[in-house]
Amino acid sequence: MCLYPTLIKNKKYQANKKNGGNIPAVSDKRVLYVPVACGKCMECKKKKSRDWQVRLLEDSKHIKNGKFVTFTFSNESISKLHKDLPIYTNKNKRKLELDGYDRDNAIAKLGVRRFLEKWRKKHKKSVRHWLITELGHEGTENIHLHGLIWTDHEEDIDKIWDYGFTWVQEKEKNINESIVNYITKYINKVDFEHKEYNPIILCSKGIGAKYLKSFFLPFCCYSFV
């Protein structure tokens, strides 16, 4: 349960199209507000980690060609990607450059996006992926990525990722619980050297969708996307 939830107004008790402007009677004023999780406290991160563990493990039962990967960024590639980051403007039209941990995550995001663009150019479609960022703890402390890539063209992973070193799981091995636990631990990992850093997840849509459909469809008439 979230440690620092925010209370927002319950739309059920506001005039809207669904109720045609007829607000239901309120028997208990406490229902006028609903708690929304902050998504940043340790309890929220633990829940997010557990949710992804289930989705990734169940997904690996249906799709067998997943590979555990690590992507790194060299100093040179970080400098180049930093120069290519977009410049944002604030309300006063002043240009703002990202810095600190926001810059690190933006560099990783741009690197992955360009990796996917190159992959689509070669294979005519994107590659299924789930990646999470982490900061190094020795030497340069450069940002890097751990995660999963689903493909039968694992030899192209290293060829297309040209920002630094890559490590790809051996072809004969499958995704298992220990691998999933390893990559999802970064969601709620306590990083004492970078206490303010929040990792980001970069992933394809629909991971775990087959599990959700098989689990929920017997109980409802809706489909999941």
Where are the language model's segments positioned?
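Right-hand nucleic-acid polymerase module
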Residues: 1-141, 151-225
